[in-house]
């Protein structure tokens, strides 16, 4: 040969001398492989032509070519058929003077007719000849080729099988298991493994049908199935002159349903002699077939290292990239130049010169959801950030932000290949590369790939072809958190629709981050609160246990305080809306300022469900974070006895389970009460706390004014109740004055009597300052012998809240020591003063003390919520009337102890009376006919326990007659224990990352928990958002409105809202654009006000008993009847939701439903027509199912 024939490859490419006039190439494919081929073609100075279907008009491969042409007319071909339309493709090639056609892989790459027609039209086919494709592309023909080359094959049918009878005959001779395979094509399509006779017919039909759909040919054959073999394939290159070389082998054993998932190069565990035998057989097969161009010979290796030839793929393979990485050979360049007539020698591709260097691995990143059996996901890619760096190669297709992933084509986004000097290095590179990817908007298989790459079997390269199917633990996947994009989705919704937080009126008045105050020591020097705080009472408790802790509290020479700012304060003043973010900000300072405090009340009660229901936070995560931030002060929680933190009785084992989780997560002191002071209900909670190992603070609820003559809750009652509690066993005795009706004189008498009766028992008193006498009452308690009182920081005190900490400390100055420097109390109060501005949109707007509390006795925590609720359901103008009705309702119920949930019974009955204009006499007279609120029925049934003095009769009997039973024992005894393992299993099937905390949450509030998890799926962890950004819509393109979010330590997001798009008339959505850490991102948001249809609803005629109207404004949750349906007395008709209440509208008499004027999710106003009945004759009342928060 001439000297120029031995020029290096890069010089040949540069002058393209081997290509001659072959300067224009068309790739008859789509997605990633055309782009790969175009890149090499450009390096060879060639012009490139892409083809595309109408559905692919936005695909990246169209843009990467010099020219691009659509296949046929719109609608002429289906999305897949377009790439199988060989005549149309050739017509495009001829029309535009194409010299070469490269088929890529898939579609027509193994279609001999296509190859033949291409060459008949004078165009070079980049691949083996049509006769070779016929000889090796058909797996049956390939088997015959193997016989001719004396290469071992798996026993199978000598030719294609036509029907089930032939398949059955084969298995009768060779036995099971067998595999039915498509004769044409690959990729796992048209394959079925059959292990027993009953499945053979279905497997044959499905394999044939699938092959027909995928490859246009339903021919199949059958062979013995090797159990747990390795899949080894050899990369071949052959020129037009009979020369064949191999580029070594690839281990493609990691498959799912016969489709390769991860490809390794080379095969690490293959013995040398087996490798050489396979390589030699591959070359022998190619020479026997007179093969040309690139191809792959595939083999199976059984457990005895015997290899069997299975097929030759007469095309380039998906995984060719890793062979290129370890050999340095550009296989596509070799294909093109061989097609143009170059020899392997001219290309410098001589077998003895080809070596491998290191190892490589390839993973296909697809839009498949591994948690749903790899179901392909579709949609628009919102974010696409790829990997890179040393040893990483990416071959991409439609992986870019804005790409629409359709269901028509393969779900691959990009092929990621990594290489390294050894097997472990390239594995670690792949893990790193996959972790760097950020793909949002569609599900991907990246989490599964990471699980695979870290599995011990994969790490040793001992996998077999069914490894994935045989290894279920691979599917215990840690899915991507997608935190940033989910936060943008929330902020986008906030920008378009405004805040959706219930109860918010207006926007926060604080327009900056709150200042964190400095804490000073006794010398006035600033303390560094970033270092661990000094030991507090919690260290003593952890070391000595509850018993000695209680003794030490009693022995304390002064008075201890519990601060309720973190729970009861914001429940009483701010609708329980203070977020974890703001508690954590002040936590380090608090751990210093109040390190001598008895406890911080920060959990339980209404904060538990409100965290999930309205703040979209996990209450357990709040507890964990606060516990970490404040390790030195005991945490206290409020526990509703046999209800846990729910508003209804639960099985005892659910209470036990919940309290174990609470104790393990960080609660120390459990303030246990029962809403009726029912000792049996109280005992459930007390016993559960003892089992959990917590400090028991058994609590008796103070109600009314014990100084008032004739009051049934007098001093004797409380002393007797306390005696029962002490006999039951408690570490601390607590008094809970929830309405603030414990006057100073009564406080002195009660605490003095308790101290005389129980001289060694610590006493803790809790009150509300509704009447303005809270500080005086707590001072009286201190002087009478109380050990602990409840106060809160000044800015969060007063009115329905607890007394002021500073005022209380000052009142005892020089008399009783609290251990809390008043200066420190003032320092942390500065922060909470700003919090009142930040949460001003939840203020109840109370102007001052309300001495009327001594008459209506509404608990402090309920007063603001009841006012807010009344406003939401249209009774705001009747607030004075509602308070009077509260007094009347309490008398009707027998003057009960009023604390959640019994206080809600009184409140619901009061609103029911006001809404329906009922007096006390009306209620008593019509009790058997009225549909009372469900909470009232629960009370009279006995589900809340038994009130002191019993139930009022005959009212109880009349109310529940025909509707409820009368319980005579503790409610929990009537409930079946929860199957907690089964509940966890159910939650794990529905939600990700389920813990015992989640199970406990679900047990307390099933619907609330489910709604919270769904919200979390949409928006992620919203607790990381600063509160002003959580409540206020972002402003467009203003530097001062940048949102800075710390999602974890040392990981910060800087978010800026850039623009809001126009309303889409077709979808009712808007696109909102953000700058996230300097990178543009977009979210699509439904505009809930953009296409609102104005609906004027008919009103029910109050004088027509056949027309049933809504009692107050709300949303239709459910319609339970249909038109012309018959109803019996008491049958539910519809369910309405109005803030805290759900109203089940039921029929008081039998009748037939006529027109139904509403549907689910409709908003209705008071008196809006719900159904019209043809035969209802009595006034319809309403059952109110209380959903509390």
From Swiss-Prot:
Main location: cytoplasm
Entry binding sites for ATP: 139, 223, 258
Cysteine pairs bridged by disulfides in the record: none
GO BP: gluconeogenesis
EC class: ligase
PANTHER family, A to Z: PYRUVATE CARBOXYLASE (PTHR43778), PYRUVATE CARBOXYLASE, MITOCHONDRIAL (PTHR43778:SF2)
Name under which the protein is recorded: Pyruvate carboxylase
């Amino acid at each position: 040969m001439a000297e120029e024939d031995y020029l290096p490859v890069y010089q040949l490419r540069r002058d393209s001398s081997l290509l001659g006039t072959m300067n224009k190439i068309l790739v008859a494919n789509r997605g990633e492989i055309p782009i790969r081929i175009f890149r090499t073609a450009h390096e060879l100075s060639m012009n490139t032509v892409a083809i595309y279907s109408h559905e692919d008009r936005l695909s990246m491969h169209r843009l990467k070519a010099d020219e691009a042409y659509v296949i046929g007319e719109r609608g002429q071909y289906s999305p897949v058929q377009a790439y199988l339309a060989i005549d149309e493709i050739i017509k495009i090639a001829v029309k535009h003077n194409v010299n070469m056609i490269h088929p890529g892989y898939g579609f027509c790459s193994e279609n001999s007719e296509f190859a033949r027609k291409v060459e008949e039209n004078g165009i070079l086919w980049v691949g083996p000849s049509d006769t070779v494709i016929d000889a090796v592309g058909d797996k049956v023909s390939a088997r015959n080729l193997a016989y001719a080359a004396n290469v071992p094959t798996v026993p199978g049918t000598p030719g294609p099988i036509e029907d089930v009878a032939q398949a059955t005959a084969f298995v009768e001779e060779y036995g099971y298991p067998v595999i039915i395979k498509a004769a044409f094509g690959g990729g796992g399509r048209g394959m079925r493994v059959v292990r027993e006779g009953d499945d053979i017919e279905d497997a044959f039909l499905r394999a044939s049908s699938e092959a027909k759909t995928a490859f246009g040919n339903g021919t199949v054959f059958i062979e013995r199935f090797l159990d747990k073999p390795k899949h080894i394939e050899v990369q071949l290159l052959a020129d037009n002159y009979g020369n064949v070389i191999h580029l070594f082998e690839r281990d493609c054993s990691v498959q799912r349903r016969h489709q390769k998932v991860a490809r390794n190069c080379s095969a690490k565990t293959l013995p040398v002699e087996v490798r050489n035998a396979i390589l030699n057989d591959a070359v022998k097969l190619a020479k026997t077939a007179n093969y040309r161009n690139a191809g792959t010979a595939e083999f199976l290796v059984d457990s005895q290292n015997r290899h069997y030839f299975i097929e030759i793929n007469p095309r380039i393979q998906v995984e060719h990239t890793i062979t290129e990485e370890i050999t340095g050979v550009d296989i596509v360049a070799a294909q093109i130049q061989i097609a143009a007539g170059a020899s392997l020698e001219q290309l410098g591709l001589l077998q003895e010169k080809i070596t491998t260097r290191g190892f490589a691995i390839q993973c296909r990143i697809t839009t498949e959801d591994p948690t749903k059996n790899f179901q392909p996901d579709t949609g628009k890619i919102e974010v696409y950030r790829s990997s890179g760096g040393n040893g990483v190669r990416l071959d991409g297709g439609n992986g870019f932000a804005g790409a629409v992933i359709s269901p028509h084509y393969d779900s691959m986004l990009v092929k990621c290949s990594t290489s390294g000097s050894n097997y472990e290095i390239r594995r670690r590179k792949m893990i790193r590369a996959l972790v760097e990817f950020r793909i949002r908007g569609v599900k991907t298989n990246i989490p599964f790939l990471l699980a695979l790459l870290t599995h011990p079997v994969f790490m040793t390269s001992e996998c077999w072809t069914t490894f994935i199917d045989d290894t279920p633990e691979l599917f215990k996947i840690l899915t991507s958190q997608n935190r940033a994009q989910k936060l943008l989705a929330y902020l986008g919704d906030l920008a378009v629709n405004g805040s959706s937080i219930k109860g918010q009126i207006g926007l926060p008045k604080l327009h900056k981050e709150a200042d964190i105050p400095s804490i000073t020591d006794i010398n006035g020097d600033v303390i560094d609160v970033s270092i661990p705080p000094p030991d507090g009472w919690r260290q003593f408790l952890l070391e000595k246990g509850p018993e000695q802790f209680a003794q030490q509290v009693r022995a304390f020479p002064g008075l201890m305080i519990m601060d309720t700012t973190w729970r009861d304060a914001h429940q009483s003043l701010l609708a329980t809306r203070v977020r974890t973010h703001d508690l954590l900000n002040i936590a380090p300072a608090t751990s210093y300022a109040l390190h001598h405090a008895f406890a911080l009340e920060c959990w339980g009660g209404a904060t538990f469900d409100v965290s999930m229901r309205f703040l979209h936070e996990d209450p357990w995560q709040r507890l964990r974070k606060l516990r970490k931030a404040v390790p030195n002060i005991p945490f206290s929680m409020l526990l509703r006895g046999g209800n846990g933190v729910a508003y209804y009785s639960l099985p005892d084992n659910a209470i036990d389970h919940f309290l174990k989780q609470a104790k393990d997560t960080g609660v120390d002191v459990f303030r246990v009460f029962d809403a009726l002071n029912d000792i049996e209900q109280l005992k459930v909670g007390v016993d559960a706390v003892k089992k959990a190992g917590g400090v028991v603070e058994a609590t008796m609820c103070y109600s009314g004014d014990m100084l008032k003559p004739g009051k049934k809750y007098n001093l004797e009652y409380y002393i007797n109740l306390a005696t029962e509690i002490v006999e039951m066993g408690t570490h601390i005795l607590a008094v809970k004055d929830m309405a603030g009706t414990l006057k100073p004189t009564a406080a002195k008498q009660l605490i003095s009597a308790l101290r005389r009766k129980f001289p060694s028992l610590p006493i803790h008193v809790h009150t509300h300052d509704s009447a303005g006498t809270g500080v005086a009452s707590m001072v009286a308690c201190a002087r009478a012998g109380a050990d602990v009182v409840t106060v809160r920081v000044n800015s969060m005190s007063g009115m329905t809240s607890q007394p002021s900490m500073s005022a209380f400390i000052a009142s005892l100055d020089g008399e009783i020591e609290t251990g809390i420097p008043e200066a420190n109390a003032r320092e942390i109060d500065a922060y909470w003063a700003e919090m009142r501005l930040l949460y001003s949109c939840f203020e109840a707007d109370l102007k001052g003390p309300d001495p009327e509390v001594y008459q209506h006795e509404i608990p402090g925590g309920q007063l603001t919520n009841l006012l807010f609720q009344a406003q939401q359901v249209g009774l705001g103008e009747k607030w004075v009337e509602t308070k009077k009705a509260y007094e009347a309702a309490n008398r009707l119920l027998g003057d009960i102890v009023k604390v959640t949930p019994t206080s809600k019974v009184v409140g619901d009955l009061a609103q029911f009376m006001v809404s329906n204009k009922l007096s006390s006499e009306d209620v008593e007279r019509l009790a058997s006919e009225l549909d009372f609120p469900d909470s009232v029925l629960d009370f009279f049934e006995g589900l809340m326990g038994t009130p002191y003095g019993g139930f009022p009769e005959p009212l109880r009997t009349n109310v529940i007659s025909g509707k409820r039973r009368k319980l005579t024992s503790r409610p929990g005894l009537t409930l079946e224990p929860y199957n907690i393992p089964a509940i966890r299993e159910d939650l794990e099937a529905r939600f990700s990352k389920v813990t015992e905390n989640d199970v406990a949450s679900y047990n307390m509030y099933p619907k609330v928990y489910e709604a919270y998890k769904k919200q979390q799926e949409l928006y992620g962890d919203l607790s990381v958002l600063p509160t002003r950004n959580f409540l206020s819509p972002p402003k467009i393109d203003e530097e001062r409105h940048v949102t800075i979010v710390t999602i974890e330590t040392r990981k910060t997001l800087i978010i800026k809202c850039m623009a809001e798009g126009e309303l889409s008339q077709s979808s009712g959505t808007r696109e909102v654009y953000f700058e996230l850490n300097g990178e543009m991102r977009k979210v699509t948001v439904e505009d809930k006000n953009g296409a609102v249809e104005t609906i004027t609803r008919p009103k029910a005629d109050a004088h027509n008993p056949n027309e049933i109207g809504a009692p107050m404004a709300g949303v239709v949750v459910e319609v339970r009847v249909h038109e012309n349906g018959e109803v019996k007395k008491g049958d539910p008709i519809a369910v309405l939701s109005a803030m805290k209440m759900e109203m089940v509208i039921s029929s008081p008499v039998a009748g037939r439903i006529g027109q139904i004027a509403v549907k689910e999710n409709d908003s209705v106003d008071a008196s809006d027509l719900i159904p019209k009945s043809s035969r209802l004759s009595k006034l319809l009342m309403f059952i109110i199912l209380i959903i509390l928060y």
